[in-house]
Amino acid sequence: MSKLTNCILNKDPSCVPVWFMRQAGRYLPEFRDIRSKNKDFIKLCLNSNLSSEITLQPLKRFNLDAAIIFSDILMVPFGLGQDVKFEKDKGPVLSSFNLKRFFENDKNNFVKKLNPIYKAIETTKMNLSADKSLISFIGAPWTLIIYMFGLKIDKNQIDLNKLQRSEEEVKIVLEKIIKYLCIHIEKQIKAGADTVQIFDSWAGLIPEEKISEYCFEPNRKIVKFCKENKIPVICFPKGLKKRNSDFVNIVSPDCLSLDYDTDPVWARENLHNVCLQGGMDPKVLFKNKREILKETDRYLNIFKDRPYIFNLGHGLLPETNPDMLYEVVERVNNFK
């Protein structure tokens, strides 16, 4: 059993696994080299050999406990027929959502379009040390709907009136997305993934009266599916803050990933019967070595004697110095 799996499932606090969101990314010169030759991000995600190579890059530099497959949460909307492009300074841009075309999707076509991802997982698993975990991931239904419907986020706020769709239509689309996310998870597990992380990046924008319908229930259904398939599941509902307590009680993830706005002391005292992950602000890594290690130690000591995975409160930023990340990884691995 890998260190990560032992921590998540057995709630073993005796050692602290370490990995990072976006650990295979733009802060690494070897990634930038591949990216410079592959301008189309979606095509890069669908290149099984390159995807696997990128996935393994950080493990060649750092003593990490897990690889996370190089892909994107928007590969599911792509598999469901929407065009997905990443424009400089604008981020992801999707073609207009067409309800009729959305419901014309079938499992075989969806799986065929995303098959290179599953091949990349198979290749990565073959080249990954047996003591390392292989994490696959999905975007939560609410977060995907924001992109699929083309909703604009302004100053971390969203106007649900701009959904321009009936509540019934949103509900039907949510259920359909859940179905295809479970198909995607199942295929990733069969390919060799041994852990799943669910990114609900925009959970914090959901109004209180809709939090159960748009966040808790969709995540609960997917977590239930993961547990039925005996796969450890990590949830990252960004922006929930103290609503994380309700999330844990209702959704019952094996592990909850904390964002950088969540007070770690509050999390330690209020989130029970769940492994915790992350929390440290990625911008801490822009500071000097002494300050970086001081904050690393703070998180390690706050969660001492709790099942805890060291990570950040969001993905690694492109400006991150790999040398500083190396120092953090060594600090975690030497923590007693």
Give a label for each model feature.
Residues 1-86, 221, 323-336:
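N-terminal basic, low-complexity leaders that serve as flexible interaction/assembly modules and, when applicable
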Residues 31-33, 82-94, 147-159, 271:
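Short, flexible, mixed-charge acidic loops at enzyme active sites
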Residues 33-45, 99-110, 249:
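Short, basic, glycine/proline-bearing loop/turn elements
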Residues 40, 96-101, 263, 281:
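Short, solvent-exposed coil/turn linker segments
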Residues 68-85, 98, 103-110, 193-211, ...:
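Glycine-rich, proline-tolerant flexible connector loops at the mouths of alpha/beta enzymes
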Residues 73-76, 91-92, 141-143:
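A short acidic, glycine/proline-enriched capping/turn motif at secondary-structure boundaries
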Residues 89-127:
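A gly/proline- and charged-residue-enriched helix-loop-helix capping module
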Residues 113-336:
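Active-site loop segments of alpha/beta catalytic cores
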